[in-house]
C-alpha cells in the first residue's frame, strides 16, 4: 500500500505539472476549471533540502539558478495563475521542475506559518563562500569600494534586512563571521526580499585577522557604535565621528556588530575609526541605539551617497517629476535596481497575488 500511495502521489505530481505546463507552453493562463481538477497533494518534505518561501525569493532563486530545485509548490485561486505566478510556472517548466499544488494547511505547517504567499520551493541550501574568494581588490583599483562586515548578527530578519539595504545601495561585498552568526536561511531570504538569492555573501573564521589584513593593504576599517559615552573607556582610544561628517576617500570596510552587545572588543580594537548616528533629541536610558538593520540603512546611504555616479539632487527631482521619460543616467540606475527590490509598501508585497 505504501508503494501504491507513492506511485499515486508521483502520478498526480506529473498531472499537476502537465496541466500547468500545457497552458504555459501555449501562452495561456491556467484557468479555474483546469486548476479545480487538480488533486490537492499532501506533501512529505524532502530531507536535506530547505523550503524557500515567498513570491520574490522563489522567483529570484529561479532566475539566479544558484540552487538546485526539487519541487515548486504553488497555490492558485479559481481565477488561475497571473503575473509572477505565471512567470514562476514558465521558468519551472523550462527547467523541468515538478510543480505541485499542496493544501493551504499543509503549506502553512511546512513553512511554520511564515508569510509564504502561496509559493514555496524545495531547494538546496546556500552557504557563505570563503572570504578569499571575494578577490584581492587593492585600493588602487577603485578608491570607492565598500565592503560590509557583519560581526555576529544572529537574528535572521535583521540579517535579511541588512542584506536588502546593502544590495539596494550598492555595497560591493558582504563578509560575515562564521561563528555566532545567522546562517543563510529561508527566513533571511524572505526578510531580504530575495536579495540573498542574487548576491554573494562571504565568511571568515578569523574576523579580526581579516580586518588587520585589509588594513595592512590600505583599507580603512570603520566600526560602528551607538551614542558616544564618556563612561566608555574605549571611546577615547579610537576616534568617533558622525556618519554625516565621514568622507569616503579610500576603500572602506564598514563593520556592524551584534544586535545586543555591538562589536566585540577584539573587532573594535582592529578598527581605525568608529562611526555613529547622532540622535536629534535627548534620549532616555535604553534608547541610545537603533536596530542594527535600521542603522545599516542610514550608515550605508550616508556613505554611498558620496559615490561617483550617485544621482544628484537635480536628477532625483527629475526622476520624481518625469518617471516615464528617464534620462540615460536614471534609466541605468533603474535597470541596476533588481526586480523585486522596489520600495513599495511591505504589506502590499506580502499580500500580492
Curated annotation (Swiss-Prot):
Pfam families in UniProt: SpoU_methylase (PF00588), SpoU_sub_bind (PF08032)
GO cellular component term, pick one: mitochondrial matrix
Reaction(s) this enzyme catalyzes, per UniProt: guanosine(1145) in 16S rRNA + S-adenosyl-L-methionine = 2'-O-methylguanosine(1145) in 16S rRNA + S-adenosyl-L-homocysteine + H(+)
Keywords: Methyltransferase, Mitochondrion, rRNA processing, S-adenosyl-L-methionine, Transferase, Transit peptide
Transit peptide: 1-20
Disordered, as annotated region: 311-353
Gene this chain is encoded by: MRM1
Localisation: Mitochondrion matrix
Signal peptide residues on this chain, from the entry's feature table: none
Record family assignment: Belongs to the class IV-like SAM-binding methyltransferase superfamily. RNA methyltransferase TrmH family.
Function: S-adenosyl-L-methionine-dependent 2'-O-ribose methyltransferase that catalyzes the formation of 2'-O-methylguanosine at position 1145 (Gm1145) in the 16S mitochondrial large subunit ribosomal RNA (mtLSU rRNA), a universally conserved modification in the peptidyl transferase domain of the mtLSU rRNA.
Enzyme class name: transferase
Chief localization: mitochondrion
E.C. code: 2.1.1.-
Entry protein name: rRNA methyltransferase 1, mitochondrial
SUPFAM superfamilies registered for this protein in UniProt: alpha/beta knot, L30e-like
Gene3D superfamilies in the cross-refs: 3.30.1330.30, 3.40.1280.10
UniProt GO BP: rRNA 2'-O-methylation; rRNA modification; rRNA processing
GO molecular function, one term: RNA binding
Species of origin: Homo sapiens
Amino acid at each position: 500500500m505504501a508503494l501504491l500511495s507513492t506511485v499515486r502521489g508521483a502520478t498526480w505530481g506529473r498531472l499537476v505539472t502537465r496541466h500547468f505546463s500545457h497552458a504555459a507552453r501555449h501562452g495561456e493562463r491556467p484557468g479555474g476549471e483546469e486548476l479545480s481538477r487538480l488533486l490537492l497533494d499532501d506533501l512529505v518534505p524532502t530531507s536535506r533540502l530547505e523550503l524557500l518561501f515567498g513570491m520574490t525569493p522563489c522567483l529570484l532563486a529561479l532566475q539566479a539558478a544558484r540552487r538546485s530545485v526539487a519541487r515548486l509548490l504553488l497555490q492558485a485561486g479559481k481565477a488561475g495563475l497571473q503575473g509572477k505566478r505565471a512567470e514562476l510556472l514558465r521558468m519551472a517548466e523550462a527547467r523541468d521542475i515538478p510543480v505541485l499544488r499542496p493544501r493551504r494547511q499543509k503549506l502553512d505547517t511546512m513553512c511554520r506559518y511564515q508569510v509564504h504567499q502561496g509559493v514555496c520551493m524545495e531547494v538546496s541550501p546556500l552557504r557563505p563562500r570563503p572570504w578569499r574568494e571575494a578577490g584581492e581588490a587593492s585600493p588602487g583599483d577603485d578608491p570607492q569600494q565598500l565592503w560590509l562586515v557583519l560581526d555576529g548578527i544572529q537574528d535572521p530578519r535583521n540579517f535579511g534586512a541588512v542584506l536588502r539595504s546593502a544590495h539596494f545601495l550598492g555595497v560591493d561585498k558582504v563578509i560575515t563571521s562564521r561563528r555566532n552568526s545567522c546562517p543563510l536561511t529561508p527566513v533571511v531570504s524572505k526578510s531580504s526580499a530575495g536579495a540573498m538569492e542574487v548576491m554573494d555573501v562571504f565568511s571568515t573564521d578569523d574576523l579580526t585577522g581579516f580586518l588587520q589584513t585589509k588594513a595592512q593593504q590600505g583599507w580603512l576599517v570603520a566600526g560602528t557604535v551607538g551614542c558616544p559615552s564618556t563612561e566608555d573607556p574605549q571611546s577615547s582610544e579610537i576616534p568617533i565621528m558622525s556618519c554625516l561628517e565621514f568622507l569616503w576617500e579610500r576603500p572602506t570596510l564598514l563593520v556592524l556588530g551584534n544586535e545586543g552587545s555591538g562589536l566585540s572588543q577584539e573587532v573594535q580594537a582592529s578598527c581605525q575609526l568608529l562611526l555613529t548616528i547622532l540622535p536629534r533629541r535627548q534620549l532616555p536610558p535604553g534608547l541610545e541605539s537603533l536596530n542594527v538593520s535600521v542603522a545599516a540603512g542610514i550608515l550605508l546611504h550616508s556613505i554611498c551617497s558620496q559615490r561617483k555616479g550617485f544621482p544628484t539632487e537635480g536628477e532625483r527631482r527629475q526622476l520624481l517629476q518625469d518617471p516615464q521619460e528617464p534620462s540615460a543616467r536614471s534609466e541605468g540606475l533603474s535597470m541596476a535596481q533588481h526586480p523585486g527590490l522596489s520600495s513599495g509598501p511591505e504589506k502590499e508585497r506580502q499580500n500580492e497575488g
